[in-house]
Structure formats: C-alpha cells, structure tokens
C-alpha cells in the first residue's frame, strides 16, 4: 500500500475493486493476536510517519472499512486506525467449557476427514467471507453511528463511529431471519444477550432485516415491525441507531405524544394502517398496539413482528386495562401493574394472543416467566416440561462479556458480611498478631468467594 517505503499488509479483501477490509495474520507458534494488534497500532498508521501524507487504504471513512488482527485461534477487529489509540473489538465465536458455560475465544478446530485439525478461526473464511454473506454485511450491517459528545470544557461536537457487527451480533440476526423466513409469523425468539453485547445495534439490524424479509412470491413476511422500548420517553439511542441504518423517509414512526398533537392510539392506528415499516413505542403505549392488531378489522390478515427490549422490567400502565376490557379478559384492575411479559402471558391464557405476530425478545437477565413465554423447548418436537426446559434462541453470556472486557466482574469486589465481620473481629480482639497469622488472614481476604458468573 506504500510502494516507496515497501509497506505491505498480509491480506486485503476487495468488493468490485474497492478495498473493504485488511488482515494482519499471525501464527500462535511464533506470535499472538496481540502482536497483530500492536502492528496495526505502531506500524499501520493512517498517515506516513515521515511525510505526514495520508495513507488512503488506512484512513477512516476513506479506505478499508474494517481491519482484522488474526492468529490461529483468535480474531480482533478495528474500524478506525488511530495509532496507540486504536480500539479493537473481539470477532470470536465464544468457547463452551464442559459445564456449558460460554467463555471468550474460539472452540478448537474440527477434525477433518483426512485426520488433520482445522484452525479455530476457520469460520472466518468458511462462513463470514462467503460471497453472499460478505456482501450482506456491507449492505445491511455496516453503518456510521453519529453521537453528540461534550468534552471536559463543555464544548459539544459530533463523534462518528464506523459500526461493523461482532460475530455474535451477525449470527443472531442471521439465525432469527432464517427461522422467520422458514416459519413465517407466530413464532417466538429470545435473545439472551448480556450487557456489553451491543443490543441496540442488534435490535436495529433485526428490525430493518425483518422489514425487508420476503416470501417466495414477493409478499412481505411482516407488514410492520413494532419496537417496544423500556422507557417512558422514547429511547433516543435506539431510535438514532434504527434511523442511521436506513435514511429513507417514512421508514420509521415513533409514537410520542410530546411530538405530535394526535393521541397515541391515533398515531399508532395511522402508522399500522398505512403500513409504516418500523413503529417505535414505549412499554406504556404497547397495549394500544396490541389492541389495534387484535380488534381492528382493517389489520386482519396482516403480519407483525414485535421486538421487545428488556420488557420484563417495566410496567405497562393504565392503558393495559383498556386492552383488557376490549378483549373481555378476566382480572380487570390488575392490568396497570403488569409487565409486558405478564400482559402477553395473560393474552396467551385468554386465547386472545394472535398468531399473526412474532415476538423477538432481547434481555440480559431472563426470568423464568420470560423463558416460558419466549423460549423454545430444548427438544422442539416435544412440549416444554421439567425434562424439556425452554431455552434462549441465541446466547451471549455475561461470562463472555466479562472476559472480553465489556463489563466488570462485580464478584471480584464481593465481600460477604460474615467474612468481613469475622476478620475485623479477630483484628480487634488481638491488637498484636504474628506475621504468619496476618499473612494467613490476608490470604483468606484475597480469596473470599468462589462463586462463578455464568
């Protein structure tokens, strides 16, 4: 990429002659993935260190979209090269241990027919780099996220981040889409994605792809996608992410009483009847949507996808009582304190839950009721039971998020009161202690709790 200085990158991937990705390769026998990241930070600068001339291939928003640091066993990626400030994200599948807990990294490579073992990172060229998959990533996933940020002096500015999907985001969206294409409306999907998983982007990609999903005859699988957010005031971050993926006018309608003179029910009715592709509502407005879908004759025969973000945490409010009355459901009066999970469970029991709606639930802390409502049986051919419990459709564990350094392991700072009291009491009772006893007490303090996060 710089003939005069004989700089060369191991691998560059092109689409129609345009460079879209670079790869620095290392082998674990001599160097690790960390060495490839250091090479990007120190030697793959977006400008020539001597002449200060820009390197087009490595310049943000000008050259390659993503830069991969790859060893035999791990893959990391960055979308902006910025010297020592270059930030890498993992692009790994996750590795299960014997207990079933998913950790950071990749599983061992498969044994091939000739007896040799495949590389743990073989999924990169066997799955990700396949022509259709590779093209779809750049067509449907890559986008520029724009945020207003303020510095320490109080000055506001626009921050741009080029978003490339992490591996679990890419697989989650693809698997849900493939299942929805095969089975149509009326299905449930539970994405058990921990904090640090990038749920906002995953929800946005899912919504846009569901809108574009088509039957073999060209008809839309879902006429509208309803996104339910866990906030009284519509989640600006989620709305912005959804809008930034597709800039077409009229694709998204946000049902917000503060931004329209129309009532929420009227806004919803207009959006659903006009076939607005993506409709964003709050938990409190969600019962209006369910009432319209179930009772409005003009919406009969239409299919809907409902994406629920952390729905089990918030209450639906008094609007749910109107839905309850409209459907003739029992237990009137309790509806205002229900969560969305409980509301849908009530619909299911009343047999009013329509089969023209698919539910896509995203949560990092699924309750038992959430699993029962949105989970799939371990053995799909058998009903849910104690021997065949429900499970999430897709999983990104807290343990993996901790090991990938997206969230902190709070148990590292966990001190049981009893242990702390006993140690403090011993110190009070004996003012002078031997060095050996003190070291033993400190050792106990350092290994307080064996609990693991899964």
Feature names for model-found ranges:
Residues 369-454:
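Interdomain helical connector at the RecA1-RecA2 junction of SF1/SF2 helicase-like NTPases
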Residues 1-225, 229, 233, 237-249, ...:
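ATP-dependent helicase/translocase motor core
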Residues 224, 275-278, 302-305, 355-360:
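Loop/turn-to-beta-strand initiation segments
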Residues 269, 276-308, 314-325, 332-349:
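Conserved RecA-like ASCE ATPase "motif II neighborhood" in helicase/translocase motors
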Residues 45, 49-70, 255-256, 305-307, ...:
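Phosphate/diphosphate-binding loops
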Residues 243-291:
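Inter-Walker segment of RecA-like/P-loop motor cores
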Residues 114-122, 156-160, 338-357:
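Intrinsically disordered, low-complexity acidic Ser/Thr-rich regulatory segments
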Residues 68-69, 279-282, 357-363:
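Structural recognition of the conserved hydrophobic beta-strand(s) that form the central parallel beta-sheet
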């Amino acid at each position: 990429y710089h003939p005069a200085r004989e700089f060369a990158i191991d691998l560059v991937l092109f689409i129609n002659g345009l460079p879209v990705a670079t790869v620095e390769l290392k082998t674990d026998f001599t160097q690790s993935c960390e060495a490839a990241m250091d090479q990007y930070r120190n030697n793959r600068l977006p400008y020539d260190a001597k002449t200060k001339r820009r390197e087009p291939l490595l310049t943000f928003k000008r050259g390659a979209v993503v830069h991969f640091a790859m060893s035999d066993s791990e893959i990391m990626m960055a979308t902006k090269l910025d010297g020592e400030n270059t930030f890498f994200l993992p692009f790994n599948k996750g590795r299960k241990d014997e207990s079933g807990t998913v950790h950071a990294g990749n599983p061992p490579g498969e044994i091939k027919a000739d007896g040799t073992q495949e590389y743990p990172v073989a999924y990169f060229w066997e799955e990700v780099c396949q022509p259709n998959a590779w093209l779809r990533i750049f067509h449907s996933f890559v986008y520029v996220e724009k945020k207003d940020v303020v510095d320490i002096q109080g000055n506001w500015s626009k921050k741009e981040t080029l978003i490339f999907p992490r591996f679990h985001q890419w697989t989650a969206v693809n698997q849900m889409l493939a299942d929805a294409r095969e089975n149509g409306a009326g299905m449930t999907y539970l994405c058990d994605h921990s904090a640090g998983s990038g749920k906002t982007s995953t929800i946005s990609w899912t919504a846009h792809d569901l809108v574009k999903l088509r039957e073999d005859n060209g008809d839309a699988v879902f006429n509208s996608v309803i996104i339910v957010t866990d906030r009284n005031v519509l989640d600006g971050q989620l709305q912005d992410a959804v809008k930034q993926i597709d800039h077409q006018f009229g694709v998204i309608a946000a049902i917000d009483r503060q931004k329209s003179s129309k009532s929420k029910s009227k806004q919803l009715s207009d959006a659903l009847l006009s076939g607005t592709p993506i409709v964003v509502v709050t938990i409190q407005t969600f019962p209006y949507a369910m009432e319209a879908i179930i009772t409005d004759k003009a919406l009969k025969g239409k299919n809907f996808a409902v994406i629920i973000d952390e729905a089990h945490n918030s209450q639906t409010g008094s609007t749910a009582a109107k839905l309850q009355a409209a459907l003739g459901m029992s237990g009137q009066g309790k509806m205002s304190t229900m969560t969305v999970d409980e509301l849908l469970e009530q619909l299911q029991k009343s047999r009013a839950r329509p089969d023209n709606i698919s539910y896509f639930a995203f949560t990092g802390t699924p309750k038992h009721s959430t699993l029962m409502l949105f989970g799939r049986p371990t053995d799909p051919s058998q009903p849910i039971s104690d021997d065949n419990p429900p499970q999430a459709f897709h999983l990104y564990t807290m343990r993996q998020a901790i090991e990938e350094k997206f969230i902190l392991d709070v148990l590292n700072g966990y001190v049981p009161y009893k242990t702390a009291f006993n140690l403090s009491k011993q110190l009070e009772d004996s003012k002078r202690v031997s060095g050996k006893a003190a070291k033993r007490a400190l050792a106990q303090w350092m290994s307080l709790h064996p609990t693991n996060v899964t």
